[in-house]
From Swiss-Prot:
An annotated Gene Ontology molecular function: mRNA m(6)A methyltransferase activity
Keyword Hydrolase attributed: no
Lineage summary: Eukaryota, Fungi, Dikarya, Ascomycota, Taphrinomycotina
Listed name of the protein: Uncharacterized protein C22G7.07c
GO biological process terms held by the UniProt record: mRNA processing
């Protein structure tokens, strides 16, 4: 199933879990989609001054364009039938059967159904990963000493068993042509509220993928030595910083650093190829947007060429929040900067604005940019481009993932074999 369900010059409809798929025989699980927009504790208003007026118009136009295109496609498919030509957007995307543990897709009037399986496995609640006391002691000790470089190559076999202390703050690579399962010793996964339902922590490591697990503030030298000695310099760097956020800080979903200075210290110029692109995911807070544009890109000697938008929608095709809300927006921004050498070689390859429309699933998980990066470099989708993902929480073939949780969404519970 392709992850891009519709695309034109200014927008696309993407299936987020499928965009992260690394093997055609290993299917992504997904959460039940939100059916109705979230209500915010404020009055609905069309007065959106200083709240992304330009973006509001952009996302609404993109959403309307996608709806119209899908309806026309459905009408073409139904021309030879006696069925009604009036097709709702929710019939084209998907519906949630709230009484079951799977998502059932509406097939009667939905032309996109041919790209879906009839049933997708749904992981209703994200698993909780816990480490044994010995592992926690190892982590505490390792965090007190400077990491020393070691490049670990996982040999081709079905399952490899390693301890956390063996891979932490090291560069690990699967250089084989197929995915490998990594059993992480000393850790367990709780799949329900009770600890009685536990299982081993087993993670998929995609073919030719690499990762560095550790704080970016402490392991930058590990990355640079890996690129210098074993890995190709990335042509694209994707950064998804844990921006300070009150609700996230309260939930303790992941570590948030309120001091943004560490972002300036990221070794972007040392890591990026001369004709390179840097894409930074950012919240809608003006302070952080300006920090990326005026501080980070300036320090990294990059030119801002594009601002993309990821519009989050419900299963019925509505924005997740009121687009006019001054409290919260149903989108996030992707700020794209390029080197001067990139501009001279690949001029006009990145649209100045673009809207990615999709149904979100697990907390803060972003759609993969892999379907778009090949276009930025004017190459085929099958060509292997070296990419570095900083603060990433999943692995991609031919990419390097660097951060505290590079294996999070690679746990086997987030995937299911088609056999």
């Amino acid at each position: 199933m392709p992850c891009i369900l519709y695309m034109d010059d200014t927008s696309c409809l993407i299936d987020l879990p499928t965009s992260l798929q690394f093997n055609k025989h290993i299917l992504p699980t997904r959460t039940k989609p939100v059916v109705k927009p979230y209500l915010l504790p404020e009055k609905s208003t069309s007065d959106y001054e200083n709240s992304g007026k330009g973006t509001v118009g952009q996302v609404l136009q993109s959403l309307q364009r996608v709806r119209r295109a899908l309806q026309l496609r459905s009408l073409d498919d139904n021309q030879s039938t006696d069925k009604s030509h009036h097709v709702q957007f929710q019939d084209i995307v998907y519906r949630s059967n709230t009484s079951a543990s799977e998502i059932h897709f509406q097939a009667e009037n939905a032309p996109l159904v041919q790209w879906y399986s009839d049933i997708f496995k749904v992981l209703v609640k994200a698993p909780v990963i816990q480490f044994e006391d010995q592992c926690l002691q190892w982590l505490k000790m390792l965090n007190t000493i400077p990491p020393s470089y070691s490049f670990i190559t996982i040999k081709s076999k079905d399952t490899v068993e390693l301890g956390l202390e063996e891979i932490y703050q090291q560069c690990v690579q699967n250089d084989g042509a197929s995915a490998i399962k990594l059993k992480l010793k000393g850790s367990k996964v709780i799949t329900e509220s009770s600890e009685t339902n536990c299982r081993d922590s087993i993670y998929y490591i995609p073919a030719r993928s690499s990762f560095i697990m550790g704080d970016v503030e402490k392991t930058a030298q590990i990355l640079l030595e890996a690129i210098d000695g074993h890995l190709e310099k990335p042509k694209c760097i994707i950064i998804d910083p844990p921006w300070p956020n009150k609700s996230v800080a309260r939930s303790s979903v992941y570590k948030v650093n309120r001091n943004l200075g560490y972002l300036k210290a990221l070794p972007i110029q040392e890591s990026l190829s001369k004709t390179g692109v840097v894409a930074v995911w950012c919240t809608n807070k003006e302070k952080y947007v300006n920090f990326v544009k005026k501080v980070l890109f300036k320090k990294w000697n990059l030119t801002l060429v594009s601002t993309w938008t990821w519009l989050k929608i419900t299963a019925f095709g509505e924005p997740l929040f009121d687009v006019y809300s001054n409290m919260r927006k149903p989108w996030e921004q992707l700020l794209i900067g390029v080197t001067s050498e990139y501009t001279s070689v690949y001029s006009d390859k990145i649209p100045p604005t673009f809207t990615i429309i999709g149904i979100p699933d697990y907390h803060s998980r972003k759609p993969s940019l892999k379907p778009f990066i090949s276009r930025w470099f004017n190459c085929s989708a099958n060509e292997s481009l070296p990419v570095l993902e900083i603060f990433g929480r999943s692995l991609t073939p031919n990419w390097i993932t660097w951060g505290r949780e590079p294996l999070l969404f690679m746990h086997e519970l987030y995937w299911s074999s088609d056999n």
